[in-house]
A protein has these predicted regions:
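Nucleotide-activated sugar donor-binding and catalytic core shared by glycosyltransferases
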Residues: 1-304
Length: 304
C-alpha cells in the first residue's frame, strides 16, 4: 500500500498564510492525496491545512515586543517542534516568518526532516550572516524577489526565483461591482486605512490613523479589517463612525483614491493597484533604535 505524502507547513502572518494557501491548492491539484498539517490561519485552513496552531496566537513584531512575549514564543516553538516530530512529515515547508521559522528549520534539520523554505528571511536587509544559517538548515530555497538568487550566490547557495504570488492574485482578482452599495458607502473619494494584520500592529496604528479623519472632511475613510483578529480591536473605529470592511482588501484598494498603510506586504499590494500611499509604522522606542542600528536599507516600505 502506497503511503500518502505528508507535508508540514508553517506561516506566521496574513500574507504568509495567503501564500501558503495558494501553495496547498497548487499541490492538491497535482496530488489530491497529500495531507497537510501545520501553523497558519484562515486561508490555509480553508485550503485544507489541519491547523496545529493558529498563527494569530503567536504573531509578534519588533525586537522588544518579541522579548516581552518571549514565554509565548518559547511555548509555541516547543508545541510546534513536538507536533512536527510526532507528525513525521515527508517535507517541512516554511513560509516567510524568519525569526520563528529559522528555529524550526534548525530543529527539523537535526531530526532529518527535509526543509524547503518558500520566501526566505530578508537577510540582505539586516544581519547578512544569517544567510549561512539558512544554507545550513535548509535543503531548498524558493524566492519571490528577482534579485535574491544573485544575492545568495555570494554564500554559494542555489536559490530559485519562482515569481511573486501577489502578481497572480491581483491578476485573477475581479472587482465587486456593488462594493459601495454592499458596504453602505457614499461616493466620496475613499482613503483606505490598512493598519496591519497582527493584533500588535492594529493596537499601535489604528488610533493614529483615525486621528487623520477630521483633516480630510471631503473624503470617506474605510478600514481594511482582518477577520481572524479579535473584533474588539476595531472598537475605536466603530465609535468614530468609520466604515470597516473585512476580507475585501483588494476591493477596497481597487476603489481607493489614496491609502495609509502599515509597512509590510500590504504596501506592495497597494502599489500593484496603483494607489498612492503613505507608509507608516509604530513600534517601541527600543525596537526603533535597535532597528536603526541593524537595518542596512534606508526604507521601511517594501515597495521602495
Amino acid at each position: 500500500m502506497v503511503k500518502n505524502k505528508k507535508i508540514y507547513i508553517i506561516s506566521g502572518e496574513r500574507s504568509g498564510d495567503l501564500h501558503a494557501s495558494n501553495l496547498i491548492q497548487a499541490m492538491k491539484a497535482t496530488d489530491p492525496s497529500i495531507q497537510f498539517r501545520g501553523m497558519g490561519g484562515y486561508y490555509s485552513k480553508e485550503a485544507g491545512l489541519d491547523l496545529a496552531v493558529d498563527y494569530s496566537e503567536v504573531a509578534l513584531m519588533g525586537f522588544i515586543e518579541v522579548v516581552l512575549g518571549f514565554r509565548k514564543v518559547i511555548k509555541y516553538l516547543s508545541l510546534i517542534k513536538k507536533d512536527l516530530f510526532n507528525y513525521k512529515p515527508d517535507v517541512l515547508v516554511l513560509v516567510d516568518y524568519g525569526g520563528f521559522n529559522m528555529k524550526i528549520a534548525e530543529f527539523a534539520k537535526a531530526n532529518h526532516i527535509p526543509v524547503h523554505y518558500y520566501i526566505p528571511p530578508k537577510v540582505w536587509a539586516w544581519n547578512q550572516k544569517r544567510a549561512l544559517k539558512l544554507k545550513a538548515f535548509t535543503d531548498k530555497v524558493y524566492s519571490i524577489l528577482p534579485f535574491e538568487p544573485d544575492f545568495f550566490k555570494k554564500y554559494d547557495m542555489e536559490v530559485k526565483y519562482v515569481g511573486n504570488p501577489l502578481l497572480d492574485e491581483i491578476k485573477k482578482f475581479k472587482a465587486h461591482d456593488f462594493f459601495f452599495q454592499k458596504n453602505e458607502l457614499s461616493y466620496a473619494p475613499i482613503i483606505a486605512l490598512l493598519p496591519g494584520s497582527r493584533t500588535q500592529e492594529v493596537l499601535a496604528m489604528l488610533n493614529k490613523m483615525i486621528a487623520l479623519v477630521p483633516k480630510f472632511p471631503n473624503a470617506q475613510f474605510v478600514i481594511a479589517g482582518v477577520d481572524g483578529l479579535n473584533p474588539s480591536l476595531y472598537k475605536p473605529a466603530k465609535e468614530a463612525g468609520i466604515k470597516l470592511v473585512f476580507n475585501q482588501t483588494y476591493n477596497l484598494l481597487s476603489h481607493a483614491t489614496a491609502a495609509v498603510v502599515s509597512s509590510g506586504t500590504a504596501t506592495l499590494e497597494t502599489a500593484l493597484f496603483r494607489v498612492p500611499q503613505i507608509v507608516v509604522y509604530r513600534t517601541s522606542p527600543i525596537s526603533y533604535h535597535i532597528a536603526k542600528r541593524l537595518i542596512r536599507i534606508p526604507y521601511i516600505s517594501f515597495v521602495n
